[in-house]
């Protein structure tokens, strides 16, 4: 025998036609391979060498000649019952035969002696029953239709006649019907075996009833089968010499233990559990059971019941079957008590014990189930708990009890449940065998093997490894048997034959079970070592079998391995191999069960014979299974096998469905195709002589003439066609592979030649006959036609004359009627047009009058507001001037005072003056309050005026005459408005003149400064030496630097003068623009008559916006979403210009005030060089108060014209550097003053020239407070200044205690590193805060600690690529700011809280508001003590706020930078896939060839600014501005989403609904998953660093804004604005929505709403019937958030010429086109812009912090043991 050691693939190896012998011509019927249907039949329509074109029913296929199989044209409709009778024995022939018989409900087919059974998934009563068994009784095999009864009968007859034991092997995959086939076999054998009695019960009845018992405890529902056997079973039925059943034995293999504790959805656990839960009520009460959903071992799956199966009836049937097989009622009760105990055992949950480190039952519910389980097991409850929660380790001389953690206790519980169930099942099998009884004197046996088929799943573990080993063994046995049958066939026919090569899988068996060195041997060896893991096992396997051709290692796996089985490659996961291979029982469980009071339970766990485990021999599941398998094969080798291969026709378990690919795979895995291949290797075609001659006698007719011998005739016939290699047997002709096809080709050639001769003769006869008939008929037809034509012509002539007359009269009547109708229509149209024109004119005049009234009221309000502001500024200037005059008088008095008493009197007078000034300030405050009241009253008046206007608008619709009168009065009001505007222009000119005067004043002051500087230089030279002697601590370098600062400030004054000049120029331009707009307003025409109705609505919106403007007083007009029409636009421009003029006037006034302050400052520098240090300090403090008030006014003005400040950003940035250097100089001077306090005081008392140097320090302090350092380049309102005298403040500063600088280094070294988090709170922020509070640094007037802490926060920006580091410092800085906000209060804060100012709109405004406002965190006083903060602390909080926004901006930019290329790749991938899809399915759609309308008719920029953000902003985070919040989503968005779901119902977040499934590795779906991956990575970074939820929501909102902008702008491109693209993007958006729901709203917030533009655009794109959409539906329901430009572009781009119903109606497009103005020509205003602004304020962070208790935060490890930082533990 020749053994062929090679692996043959599945494709094309079973063909009996070799490529060289295939003869294919045009017209041949062949089979071609197809990936979907396995094989398709068709006709060859073209043959080109080795390639042919085959026309199938559904498509045309081009294939190679050697890749096709011939088709039998004479194939019977119902197929053949034995596939060896097929003319062509190949894969397509086998599939066709099985399918034909399956459709005819003939589910059984022979392949030689092999029976193939196809599961019908329905009842077929005609195939079973006693009458059917009677038919097959004693019938020869193959005489009747194929049936399992025939196989059983053949086995029984051979056993009786030949005296040889038989075996029937039933195999197939789960759900193929193995169990049912086994039942029928046993039923027939019991029928044939008679009725021998054994103890009152028949043996055959016990054998049959053992099936339901074993099914109840060994079968379960799986995904593939509702009654899947989870164990292998071999039933040995013993017969005596009379052929009667004398005994039986059941052997089981490899029960699936893990199913007891772990069930996957939608599978079920073993049937017995559900039967017991459905038992009668008294049974369930006894076992304290309930519904299956209440038990952990059953509720892991949602499937608790099976269709058409009643578990309660099955329970009673099982109990009845137990009675039959000999299980007593007491034993049955014990069995089900154990089953119930297992269920209760699974409900025991464990938690960590409070008394020890071990585990204990979690709650009362767990203890209840523990108690019930102990009761059912009849064991001690405490002992059961200890066995589950403890382990006893036996050492030399003692035993150690080790407590288990909750997880290990749960594993111990599951281990006990599995071993108890396994022991119970083994007991049942043993009991059934003992009950049935085995006959030791039996002569023969018939074994029925019900074994699992070949299995290959996504995850393959130890069970699949053992199952596939079994199938490899059985396949080898099967191959050898089939080969033997083939040899017997050839020997019987007495033909010459050679040995046949067939596949041998011995190498796979050696790989698995060879000892030593096999996989099982290595697995057992690994199990013997306690430290072995699946990693070491896998490594050992790789080292041992790395070069084996049947063993491979997967590329991306570390512990998996792949074995090349006969049915395909299977990859096994080794994670649970070691645990599943170990066959041991936990000692505690063994002792507990053995000590049970129930004899049944204790019998399941008998005492071990060997007390010491060391002396016992190691045993494993793999070794035991191998031994059982070897014993099974030895038994099979002693018997004659019969094979039944069960096939599952489909995976949906439904009848009438036959899946070719699935069936073919099962035939290959079951070895059927291998048997066919072995047959094909010899003589696959075998025809009896009579059939062969009947089919091919036309090839040699002379061989069959008269009387002939069949053998000689066959030889002559084969010699005629020159066929070689055939064999002539006794009754059959044996042909080689391909010879049958060659004979068919010769036969078709002969038949074709004969058919052509017959066709030629018949065609000749028919053509001659037809010609003669046509000749005689044509003669008669011609005569008849000529007469008929003459008659017809006469009638036509008469008819023509009559018709001419009738037409003349008819045309006359039609023309008259049409003319009359036209006249009537013209009159009607003219009257309608005149009426419409009159109505339009009336409505226009009505609206114009209302607009004029509104404008007049607004202008009056604006003028009054300007007047009040001017009055307020004048009062402030007067107060400042009076203060300055009083200061001069005070200086004169001090210069006259020589003695100490005089000085004290002067001081007293000065204090009185200060009190007077204080009263003046109080008076000014009262005036401000009065102004506020006046302002409020004006607002109320304006509201009432607006209400009156609304009433007037309603009254305008009463009569036409009243409206005309109101229009005349409106014209008079317009003239008054023109006069007011002229006055306003005059006032503007006056302001310009005032600016000129201020410039002159500045110039004069500059000259004074120069003179004072020259005098100062001369004086300084004379007193330089004396100053050095008396005040040696003053450094000359400091003086030089201060002089340099003075020069820089001079340059600053000149810069501000230039700024004023530029503002004057802007004022002139504004004035000219106002005049031009007034002229344009007077000469505007009356267009857009069709939009008058819409203008009325827009006018109402304008009134609403004006009300909002008066309420907010911040100059920001609320967006008006429907401003259209030239006339309304001009009126809006006019109102806007008035607002601009107001803003310019306020700006000029504010600049004037600023110049006044600078002038006062310079004049004070000249005067204060002659005063003492303390006197100058007092005067400076008062001046600073005034400057603070003035700067606050300037801040209000700057908010109104914030956009104008962008022009001076560069200059202010340079100013920041100057301020920073000044601050550093001030700190140095302050330190020097503190160190040499005594020397400087003595110098001030004794030196006559002490007025020089101290003045420099004074200048430094003055300018430090005037220009505080800011972070973003904007002017900041002054920091709160202590209310005490400047001199007293200086004295207190000199007296402050020394800070603990020696501990600062330790603190900085600790917090500069990542010290992590404690209870989700940052340790670094908590440590810094506690140290600053403890050291009282917030109350210090001067300290450098804050300057040393700030650079630590700057380290987060040094590495902007490290997102984790940025998130860490973002959490620390925000938490520290929260702590500062709740703890610090401004030193100048009074008890009365002022009225809350409007929310600032700029980055600088938010910072200063957070700087000024007290902490907004609502915390009780006992949590933290309020601290009276000084300037350094407030400045530190300001810098901290700036760092938070800087770090946030960098982090957001990193996210955007990572997300942008991935989104671009996604969009590009969708474009490519959309083009491919469109080329195949949408070739008729050519909408993209039609260019859309020019963008010149899109909406104006004003509309775009209302719908989108306020434009692209600077990426400089320090100067960033907040964007306008997007308008909230309208309720109609929900309707849009609902409509989107209706249009695309399958668009759900699952992989099954994807529109395209590209085969490339870089598919768009994978790229979209990259976006989800980035979002998951971002979410993980935020969670890891405990970023506050408020900031996390802002980050995700801004990220989703960027996604919305990129996706929406892409959809507005021509290639992306398609139906297919919309569906694909919508699928991914559903996945993104699913991700948002999984990420929870706490982190993502309202991020999903940021995609509203893209979602609404997709609604329009994926709507199929776009022609039914109206304009109102489009703008109100479908896409309310999209602008007119965007809607117009989408409607034009998605237009398809050949599908009018899929296009938007032309009326809607024309309406959109009318609304698009000509101003946007060549613009791209339809695109969305990215918004890089900071979307939050400092107070919002503090308000959003949820955690307000930091008492449980642990300090850093480095500081915990330091005694100097013991306060951190308090």
Swiss-Prot record:
<dbReference type="Pfam" id="PF01843">
    <property type="entry name" value="DIL"/>
</dbReference>
<feature type="domain" description="Myosin N-terminal SH3-like">
    <location>
        <begin position="25"/>
        <end position="73"/>
    </location>
</feature>
<feature type="region of interest" description="Disordered">
    <location>
        <begin position="1477"/>
        <end position="1566"/>
    </location>
</feature>
<feature type="region of interest" description="Disordered">
    <location>
        <begin position="1388"/>
        <end position="1407"/>
    </location>
</feature>
<keyword id="KW-0112">Calmodulin-binding</keyword>
<feature type="domain" description="Dilute">
    <location>
        <begin position="1347"/>
        <end position="1718"/>
    </location>
</feature>
<feature type="binding site">
    <location>
        <begin position="225"/>
        <end position="233"/>
    </location>
    <ligand>
        <name>ATP</name>
    </ligand>
</feature>
<keyword id="KW-0518">Myosin</keyword>
<keyword id="KW-0547">Nucleotide-binding</keyword>
<keyword id="KW-0067">ATP-binding</keyword>
<feature type="domain" description="IQ 2">
    <location>
        <begin position="799"/>
        <end position="828"/>
    </location>
</feature>
<dbReference type="GO" id="GO:0016459">
    <property type="term" value="C:myosin complex"/>
</dbReference>
<dbReference type="InterPro" id="IPR036961">
    <property type="entry name" value="Kinesin_motor_dom_sf"/>
</dbReference>
<keyword id="KW-0175">Coiled coil</keyword>
<feature type="domain" description="IQ 3">
    <location>
        <begin position="822"/>
        <end position="851"/>
    </location>
</feature>
<dbReference type="GO" id="GO:0003774">
    <property type="term" value="F:cytoskeletal motor activity"/>
</dbReference>
<dbReference type="Pfam" id="PF00612">
    <property type="entry name" value="IQ"/>
</dbReference>
<comment type="function">
    <text>Myosin heavy chain that is required for the cell cycle-regulated transport of various organelles and proteins for their segregation. Functions by binding with its tail domain to receptor proteins on organelles and exerting force with its N-terminal motor domain against actin filaments, thereby transporting its cargo along polarized actin cables.</text>
</comment>
<feature type="domain" description="IQ 5">
    <location>
        <begin position="870"/>
        <end position="899"/>
    </location>
</feature>
<dbReference type="InterPro" id="IPR037975">
    <property type="entry name" value="MyosinXI_CBD"/>
</dbReference>
<dbReference type="GO" id="GO:0030048">
    <property type="term" value="P:actin filament-based movement"/>
</dbReference>
<keyword id="KW-0505">Motor protein</keyword>
<dbReference type="InterPro" id="IPR027417">
    <property type="entry name" value="P-loop_NTPase"/>
</dbReference>
<dbReference type="InterPro" id="IPR004009">
    <property type="entry name" value="Myosin_N"/>
</dbReference>
<dbReference type="Pfam" id="PF02736">
    <property type="entry name" value="Myosin_N"/>
</dbReference>
<feature type="domain" description="IQ 1">
    <location>
        <begin position="774"/>
        <end position="803"/>
    </location>
</feature>
<feature type="domain" description="Myosin motor">
    <location>
        <begin position="78"/>
        <end position="748"/>
    </location>
</feature>
<feature type="binding site">
    <location>
        <begin position="172"/>
        <end position="179"/>
    </location>
    <ligand>
        <name>ATP</name>
    </ligand>
</feature>
<comment type="similarity">
    <text>Belongs to the TRAFAC class myosin-kinesin ATPase superfamily. Myosin family. Plant myosin class XI subfamily.</text>
</comment>
<feature type="region of interest" description="Actin-binding">
    <location>
        <begin position="511"/>
        <end position="545"/>
    </location>
</feature>
<feature type="compositionally biased region" description="Basic and acidic residues">
    <location>
        <begin position="1494"/>
        <end position="1506"/>
    </location>
</feature>
<dbReference type="Pfam" id="PF00063">
    <property type="entry name" value="Myosin_head"/>
</dbReference>
<keyword id="KW-0677">Repeat</keyword>
<dbReference type="InterPro" id="IPR000048">
    <property type="entry name" value="IQ_motif_EF-hand-BS"/>
</dbReference>
<protein>
    <recommendedName>
        <fullName>Myosin-10</fullName>
    </recommendedName>
</protein>
<feature type="coiled-coil region">
    <location>
        <begin position="900"/>
        <end position="1253"/>
    </location>
</feature>
<dbReference type="GO" id="GO:0005524">
    <property type="term" value="F:ATP binding"/>
</dbReference>
<dbReference type="GO" id="GO:0003779">
    <property type="term" value="F:actin binding"/>
</dbReference>
<feature type="region of interest" description="Actin-binding">
    <location>
        <begin position="547"/>
        <end position="570"/>
    </location>
</feature>
<dbReference type="InterPro" id="IPR036018">
    <property type="entry name" value="MYSc_Myo11"/>
</dbReference>
<dbReference type="GO" id="GO:0007015">
    <property type="term" value="P:actin filament organization"/>
</dbReference>
<dbReference type="InterPro" id="IPR001609">
    <property type="entry name" value="Myosin_head_motor_dom-like"/>
</dbReference>
